[in-house]
Curated annotation (Swiss-Prot):
One Pfam family it belongs to: Methyltransf_16
Lineage: Eukaryota, Metazoa, Chordata, Craniata, Vertebrata
Designated name of the protein: Putative methyltransferase-like protein 21E pseudogene
Signal peptide: none
Broad class of enzyme this protein falls into: transferase
Organism: Homo sapiens
Gene behind this protein: METTL21EP
Length: 271
């Protein structure tokens, strides 16, 4: 399992994450830690590590110092301030903690998962934060989502990557399971990475999402997927996902109910 590197930060967390921060503040190991058996010690250490890293992740979100007529939230990754415009009345136009987890992972594991000059697609890009971070890390990025979200997605990506990214990110419509052969023909799908954050929840398009993952993947494509577990439906989707992909849990954040997965397509000839 991959361990994140802790980084120092002076950023103030947003009010929307204050409750999470209270629950995940860094604390010292209890004085009786060394009186526990080895298994209990390991459980305590993992809880301690989880809270340390989650505190650092959430601290990447901070309160704007200027009050403007436009509502936006600010984040700090790859040495850049990233300003994101959200729409609180739409699930797809809000930055969720899973996106912060995935961004932090990409930044702190940039050597192992090198994005430079890689072809990357994000499905369910929402506000575009993950796509922006991947672009700032040097990737050829295609950010996708539903047509009604593309305007805000394009705005956020353009304002945060112009003159900063090695490659100009693309924004495209992608409704899961719809016109995949037309809009994303398999012959031109040469994605090194598929990124996804919080795309699995109580919506009626889980089968279409699975079809989309399968369609976009080649044998060499790596999926990096951050997922928040809320209901039994999420567990059932993971079971279905495992029928098509080899799935590896690379990190877990119990205090957030979020897991980070790496997946590759199963070798159909060996199934």
């Amino acid at each position: 399992m991959i361990h994140f590197n802790l980084l120092e930060t002076q950023l103030t967390p947003l009010a929307s994450f204050q409750e999470i921060m209270k629950k995940t503040s860094i604390y010292h190991l209890p004085s009786f830690h060394y009186l526990m058996d080895s298994e209990a010690q390991e459980d305590t250490r993992e809880a301690y590590d989880d809270k340390q890293v989650v505190t650092e992740i959430m601290a990447r979100c901070f309160i704007p110092t200027l009050i403007t007529t436009t509502s936006w939230e600010s984040f700090h990754f790859i040495g850049h301030e990233i300003r994101i415009t959200e729409a609180m009345d739409c699930y797809g136009a809000v930055v969720w903690p899973s996106a912060l987890v995935l961004c932090y992972f990409l930044e702190t594991n940039a050597k192992q998962y090198n994005m430079v000059d890689k072809n990357v697609i994000e499905i369910g890009a929402g506000t575009g934060l993950v796509s922006i971070v991947a672009s700032l890390l040097g990737a050829h990025v295609t950010a996708t989502d539903l047509p009604e979200l593309l305007g805000n997605l394009q705005y956020n990506i353009s304002r945060n990557t112009k003159m900063k990214s090695k490659h100009l990110p693309q924004v495209k419509e992608l409704s899961w399971g719809v016109a995949l052969d037309t809009n994303f023909p398999r012959s031109s799908n040469n994605f090194d990475y598929i990124l996804a954050a919080d795309v699995v929840y109580a919506h009626p398009f889980l089968e279409e999402l699975l079809i989309t993952f399968d369609h976009l993947c080649k044998e060499t494509t790596i999926i990096l997927w951050a997922m928040k577990f809320r209901l039994e439906k999420e567990n059932k989707f993971v079971d279905r996902f495992k029928e098509l992909f080899d799935l590896e849990e690379i990190s877990s954040f119990p205090s957030l109910n979020i897991k980070l997965y790496k997946a590759v397509k199963k070798n159909r000839r060996s199934v």
